[in-house]
């Protein structure tokens, strides 16, 4: 049996977090997801663990008497913005010396999915490469998380990256505006700016999560090289030395800054995460600092 994507200890820590959106969309609730707890006459949907600072009025005291543990009752107050996680499963995500980018990316996707489900968000896990794969849809609480985790565990890498085609098909498949979290290395022969702008123009709020292996940014190679493109199979021969490495790293950083500017220009957010950073540290560090979760 494969190891779980997210262990139980981290899941409990994730219950403190909320996926945060900045836009207020007509007919849907925007901003902080804090209105989901106690409220007389509201529809009960789920429980979560009590954390310091939570409202004691929302505690299920009957559960406390039976289990000697504090749980908060959660209620659905209004329709919520859909949270859609676009997960890159193209061949380039297979690279990475210490665990590939794909394994790392789907752990991030699992964590974001759990945060959303605990807060009663409507979640869509949408894999893509040169086209959209089958999606997983869930809402209504943490009891759906195991199904989501199984879905992510069973995903297979394949295909080249076609951001524009994936974005076009995504808009057609999910016309309702919402929050789109893209988890990818963003390595596409075509410029990623146009498809990201396309998503924003249709009213979606963007959170761009770029993951890379250390060797993506600072290749350890030296000498005469014959490199093969992981997605197309094309070969290129080149000489690589410390000067070429410095130029390459500078170009990589410039591209990351370009993605950041694309996100900010469209009132979205960007976070870049090397896979050498532990997943828990990435969640409570860069992703929290970016405002994607809080």
For the regions a language model picked out, list residue spans one by one:
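Von Willebrand factor type A / integrin I
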Residues: 1-36, 172-178, 188-294
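An amphipathic, basic-hydrophobic helix/alpha-beta surface used to engage anionic
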Residues: 1-139, 179-183, 189-190, 194, ...
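Short, flexible loop segments at the rims of nucleotide/cofactor-binding pockets, characterized by
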Residues: 62, 156-160, 184
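Short coil/turn segments at secondary-structure junctions
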Residues: 93-97, 154, 243
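Conserved phosphate-coordination/catalytic loops
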Residues: 103, 157-164, 250-253
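Short, contiguous clusters of charged residues that form electrostatic/catalytic patches at enzyme active sites
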Residues: 107, 111, 161-168, 257, ...
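Short, electropositive alpha-helical surface patch
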Residues: 136-150, 288
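Von Willebrand factor
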Residues: 144-178, 190, 212-213, 217
